[in-house]
Amino acid sequence: PKNIHKAIDIIVKGKSAPIDSFRVNNHFACMLSGIGLDATIAHRFAEQKRRGLLTYIRISALSFLKTGAYPVSIKTNTDNIIQTDIRFVSIANSNQFGNHVTIAPGASLHDGLLDIVVVQKRNRLLTVMSVLIQILFGKIKPVASASNQKKTILYFQSKEINIENPNLAPLHIDGEPIETAKQIHINITPSALLMIQPL
């Protein structure tokens, strides 16, 4: 909670429970990581002298209109391979996307799994509509395979993924811009932290 008195009350009276974390090329991550459009926004927002919601909306709109697609190959721990051009890929450990938006509604800090959302290259109007539908009604779907990529959004779970990123799509970890790489390895660390929670 933002209220300091409520926060202190939870610290004093709450209970600790284990939560998962994950690693992105050996960098610690807790909530959400991504490559592509959302990372582009994170990098550009970090460069701004003025912060705040209006700046974030402006940067997001400009980035959406100007950022192209990136070719990637994603391999899961079950050896499924997805080869596609993406607007962005989000790797979620929790369902919070930012500003109370949930891109991965089924994500949990306690299940030992990463939720991966792959937004493929489509026309911009279809992308917006598909992302909004995912935010409002999204559910976990079966792991997508290379032969099943007709939908704009692919949504699946995995303990580990490897992303080939030949065109160096930008990368962020928990909203912070990070130097990208052509090979990105991401894996879950179950019950890595203790977090104080309300009773």
What are these regions (language model features)?
Residues 1-87:
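Catalytic core of DAGKc-family lipid kinases
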Residues 8-14, 98, 152, 173-178:
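Short, solvent-exposed secondary-structure boundary motifs
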Residues 27-33, 82-84, 88-93, 97-99, ...:
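Short hydrophobic-aromatic micro-motifs
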Residues 76-78, 83, 108, 120-199:
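ATP/nucleoside-binding phosphotransfer catalytic cores, i.e., glycine-rich phosphate-binding loops
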